């Protein structure tokens, strides 16, 4: 199996996804080639390489140049829709030129199948379990409640409620300082880190938290491009990162196969009750976290990605 991997071209966490994808091909001795932009020299090398298929992550923009060239050369295209369902409007443009559709959202997969597309696969963004793992951390990383990520409205509301609980709360992510009231920011038990933290730091925060709050991006967020308003029912990649650390998480999506051990909350009162319960019952946190780990590692690690791609390739051959 010869894989052409087109780098996403995005910054932030996507630069890590690109690196981890390349590492997983190396670790599994998969024959691969990496390309960035469709420039003349790269295109010549691709033709000489003769890939069996192309894998490309697609988020909030359509890679027209790549899709046009690849189709013109009859190189099968596997699009990995890593922002479903939030940019479904973009995805619906891209899948018209795809030979296989890989999506991180099971509801999106069902929708594509309803439209008549056949080669549709649920493939969540896996975890780099060599980085995200259980480890001891300095006391400065400890918190009772931790949330990492962009301040979506549901997360902001959650934090406004969490500050009234008798626990230390740490919030990490760009722009949080803009969305939380000043009286919240001044609370001594609240620590707001208004910057993006790379995975190498995030792993320490996960390991240092009693509870990681994993509230998902809303499907109807104002800046989404999801005209069909497809709801997200699948866990985000942060779920697997936290689980691989054997850290305890509370999430707002209901547990479902293949992640039946995830602990969910349903509404604000349930969140506060479960936060209090699990803070005071560390043995229950450890039990749930261990179950989360077993459901995630090794099944949803980057090392397993080449085997999943090979299975798809064989099914389409």
Swiss-Prot record:
<comment type="function">
    <text>May be involved in maturation of the outermost layer of the spore. May act as a glycosyltransferase that contributes to the glycosylation state of the spore.</text>
</comment>
<dbReference type="Pfam" id="PF13524">
    <property type="entry name" value="Glyco_trans_1_2"/>
</dbReference>
<dbReference type="Pfam" id="PF12996">
    <property type="entry name" value="DUF3880"/>
</dbReference>
<dbReference type="InterPro" id="IPR024542">
    <property type="entry name" value="DUF3880"/>
</dbReference>
<dbReference type="InterPro" id="IPR055259">
    <property type="entry name" value="YkvP/CgeB_Glyco_trans-like"/>
</dbReference>
<protein>
    <recommendedName>
        <fullName>Spore protein CgeB</fullName>
    </recommendedName>
</protein>
